[in-house]
């Protein structure tokens, strides 16, 4: 694979045969560290092979007629680049403690293909559908796509109106689309549950406080002009789980952290949800680890843990709380690459314009801050 000369069908056949053998059989991976590492090697090879084939189909890069085409293309196929890159690196990380060098060259080539080709190429194509009077930034809406701030009305209230007794909503911080696609496949393949997948157009800028507020029932969203630029739903702060619970009380709902719900157990859990129609459950693993410099290299491991925890959480809701409908969503996603960013990848916007109220690495928010040729500019209204 590293030499770009492998027959991928032959490779997959070989991987399948080796997995069924003694040393890397999935039924025996708990036997020893070397057995688990061998199994991870084959996971990495399989992901790299699929990535190579996908890249060959898009060798000329990406081109979209508009934002709708870009979003549809991503959710249909392009998301696989992010997924396979994550799966490869997660598997390769499991091999590293053994001190084996067999994946090192392949890892370098995967990194070059992802951070040196895929991210820049997709970024260029995405930029083109943002700009201009008819671009996405001029009107943050796409035909056929639900905006994130309409989540409650379109996804929750619609089910209640249709007769569903109780809706459980799990919000997993930074749980991105490609990971959700993997979860849906796992759920449909291993359990009696039926899972489907759809996407929304996220709020801009995409960060936790705004994304979490957008998912709540509300009539208005606005910024409070204080030091933190708090997001207000219907004039009330909703930055904490308790405050979100207060907002949900207006629709006969409650808010709770995932760990706290699981700790209640079956009987107390049923008592907790008995008089409620809407239960918002907050899960945080990916953002907790991936958004900190000291632990960001654990991002892909956090995704793997999240897939397991969300499956367990949904199973608990259905089996122990008699839930019939569970909606799983996120406040935002994430973008992560193993190699550090080059200076060319970083914004050249050094000074904060007059009127800036909130300044972060990825965005600035303010009143009348104008436009800059070094950044994309829009209006939160």
Give, region by region, the residue ranges found by the protein language model:
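Feature captures the catalytic ectodomains and active-site-proximal regions of enzymes
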Residues: 1-381
């Amino acid at each position: 694979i590293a030499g770009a000369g492998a027959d991928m069908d032959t490779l997959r056949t070989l991987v399948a045969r080796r997995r069924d053998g003694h040393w890397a059989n999935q039924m025996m991976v708990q036997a020893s560290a070397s057995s688990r590492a061998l199994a991870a090697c084959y996971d990495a090879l399989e992901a790299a092979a699929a990535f190579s084939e996908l890249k060959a189909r898009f060798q000329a890069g990406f081109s979209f007629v508009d934002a709708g085409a870009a979003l549809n293309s991503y959710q249909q196929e392009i998301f696989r680049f992010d997924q396979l890159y994550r799966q490869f690196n997660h598997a390769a990380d499991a091999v590293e403690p053994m001190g084996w060098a067999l994946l090192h060259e392949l890892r370098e080539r995967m990194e070059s293909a992802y951070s040196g080709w895929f991210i820049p190429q997709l970024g260029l194509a995405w930029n083109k559908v943002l700009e201009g009077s008819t671009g996405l930034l001029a009107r943050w809406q796409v035909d056929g796509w639900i905006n994130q701030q309409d989540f409650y009305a379109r996804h929750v209230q619609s089910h209640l109106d249709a007769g569903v007794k109780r809706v459980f909503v799990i919000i997993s911080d930074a749980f991105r689309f490609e990971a959700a696609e993997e979860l849906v496949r796992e759920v449909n393949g291993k359990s009696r549950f039926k899972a489907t997948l759809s996407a929304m157009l996220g709020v801009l800028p995409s960060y936790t406080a705004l994304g979490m507020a957008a998912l709540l029932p509300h009539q208005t969203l606005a910024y409070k002009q204080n030091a933190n630029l708090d997001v207000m739903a219907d004039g009330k702060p909703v930055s904490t789980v308790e405050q979100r619970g207060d907002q949900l009380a207006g629709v006969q709902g409650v808010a709770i952290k995932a760990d706290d719900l699981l700790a209640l157990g079956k009987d107390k859990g049923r008592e907790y949800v008995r008089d409620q129609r809407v239960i918002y459950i907050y899960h945080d693993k990916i953002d907790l680890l991936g958004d900190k410099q000291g632990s960001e290299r654990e991002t892909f491991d956090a995704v793997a843990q999240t897939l397991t925890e969300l499956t367990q959480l949904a199973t608990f809701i259905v089996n122990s709380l008699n839930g019939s409908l569970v909606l799983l969503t996120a406040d935002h996603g994430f973008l992560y690459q193993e190699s550090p960013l080059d200076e060319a990848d970083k914004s050249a916007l050094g000074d904060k314009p007059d009127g800036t109220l909130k300044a972060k690495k990825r965005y600035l928010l303010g009143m009348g801050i104008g436009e800059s040729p070094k950044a994309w500019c829009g209006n939160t209204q």
